[in-house]
């Protein structure tokens, strides 16, 4: 059994190409490029060990405010006299507001909002982070590290990379669709959930993780699974978040990330899987964090995580694959496995509490919402053109162009 620390419990011809053959090759090439781009974007790496021992304010209220603000805007996008009869249409509008093809809106917001505390934060910290983080030791042509590293934030008492918010709203929708497909095929809700998680494990083991960066992130899978329940809660449960009243759709209860975040989103608690090549680069850096295991903040946090951890379907299914020999045991990639020192957080742990109370960094939800709205209105949106040229021996050149939509403060 695997515990929570380790988890879980082409052609060679010459000449011109014409007609249908050219079209076929073009379509295949474009599809391949899109898959790789999406894979690289999904392979944004994060390092929670870097934040160990560093103070970080809980940003639950700010993140909740953003999620609820976008839901309000999704509802408002429909004319008052032409409200959709189907709740799922509102959910689709919400999903479109939260995600994008590569870097998702909610993640970019978390990177930049003054109301979200994060590590690293500021140019100097970011430079240090790129130089010393868990994935800093990599070859120049390591495409898996070309995308930006994601900072750590804290929500519901759990530290995780901002990429998990993107997984929640993006891959969570994919899981939701797979779940509904299973139900339509006559599967039980339990089997439909397993169908969705199984697809996610397969994708993360291939283009979205292992092939793109040499990392199979189980915390990403946990965020994906939570995202499925996030979308189910909008319309498909007995007490949905969205309800239809006389004046149209309204939020019956606010979105609360406390319902979805678990300690298994923290990659220092639930380690990913690595390919041999990636592990050779990661392990020496991981060993430099061993002395932080005894840091009082780290000891308290890891004890608290174990109290909060109630297991998960993702953990169960990963453990099944480990037992079948289909994937590696994540325990071998944990900090406990590489450090000679014992983990102090396992010694003399206090009695598990019946309920973990989370004290947020902000007390007045309405005030936080107002601040998030004001910040959003003070930003201007614009597009940047990006161009690149790559030359390799012998005499092979490739070029790329792209447009990045971004924002910056107006004042």
Annotate the PLM regions.
Residues 201-204:
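Active-site glycine-rich loop that binds ribose-phosphate moieties when present
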Residues 42-198, 208-221, 225-386, 393-407:
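Intrinsically disordered, low-complexity, mixed-charge
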Residues 17-30:
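Bacterial N-terminal signal peptides that target proteins for export
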Residues 10, 14, 29, 398-400, ...:
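Serine residues within intrinsically disordered or low-complexity segments
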Residues 10-12, 30, 371, 377-378:
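Extended rod-forming repeat segments used as scaffolds/tethers
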Residues 29-37:
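Bacterial N-terminal signal peptides
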Residues 3-4, 13, 23-24, 34, ...:
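Generic short amphipathic/hydrophobic targeting helices enriched at N-termini
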Residues 5, 9, 18-20:
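Compositionally biased, intrinsically disordered low-complexity segments enriched in Pro/Arg/Gln/His
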């Amino acid at each position: 059994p695997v515990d929570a620390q380790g988890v879980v419990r082409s052609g060679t011809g010459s000449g011109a190409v014409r007609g249908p053959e050219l079209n076929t090759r073009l379509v295949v090439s474009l599809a391949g490029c899109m898959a790789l781009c999406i894979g690289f974007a999904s392979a944004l790496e994060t390092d929670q060990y870097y934040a160990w021992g560093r103070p970080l304010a809980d940003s639950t209220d700010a993140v909740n405010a953003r999620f609820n603000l976008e839901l309000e805007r999704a509802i408002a996008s429909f004319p008052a006299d032409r409200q959709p009869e189907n709740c799922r249409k509102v959910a689709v509008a919400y999903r479109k507001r939260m995600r994008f093809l590569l870097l998702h809106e909610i993640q970019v917001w978390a990177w930049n909002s003054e109301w979200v505390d994060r590590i690293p934060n500021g140019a100097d910290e970011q430079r240090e982070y790129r130089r010393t983080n868990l994935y800093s030791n990599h070859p120049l042509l390591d495409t898996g590290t070309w995308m930006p590293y994601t900072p750590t934030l804290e929500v519901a008492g759990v530290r995780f990379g901002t990429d998990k918010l993107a997984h929640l709203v993006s891959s969570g929708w994919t899981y939701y669709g797979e779940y509904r497909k299973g139900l339509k095929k006559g599967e039980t809700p339990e089997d439909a959930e397993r169908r969705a998680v199984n697809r996610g494990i397969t994708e993360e083991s291939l283009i979205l993780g292992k092939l793109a960066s040499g990392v199979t992130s189980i915390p990403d899978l946990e965020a994906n699974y939570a995202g499925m329940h996030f979308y189910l809660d909008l319309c498909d449960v007995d007490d949905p978040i969205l309800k239809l009243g006389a004046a149209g759709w309204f939020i019956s209860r606010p979105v609360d990330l406390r319902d979805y975040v678990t300690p298994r989103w923290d990659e220092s608690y639930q380690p990913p899987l690595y390919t041999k090549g990636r592990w050779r680069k990661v392990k020496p850096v991981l060993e430099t964090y061993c002395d932080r295991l005894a840091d009082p903040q780290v000891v308290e946090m890891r004890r608290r995580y174990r109290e909060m951890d109630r297991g998960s379907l993702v953990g169960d299914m990963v453990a099944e694959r480990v037992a079948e020999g289909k994937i590696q045991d994540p325990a071998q990639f944990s900090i406990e496995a590489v450090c000679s020192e014992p983990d102090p957080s396992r010694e003399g742990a206090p009695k598990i509490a019946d309920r973990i109370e989370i004290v947020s960094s902000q007390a007045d939800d309405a005030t936080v919402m107002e601040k998030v709205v004001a910040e959003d209105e003070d930003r201007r949106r614009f597009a940047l053109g990006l161009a690149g040229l790559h030359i390799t021996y012998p005499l092979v050149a490739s070029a790329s162009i792209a447009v990045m939509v971004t924002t910056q403060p107006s004042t």
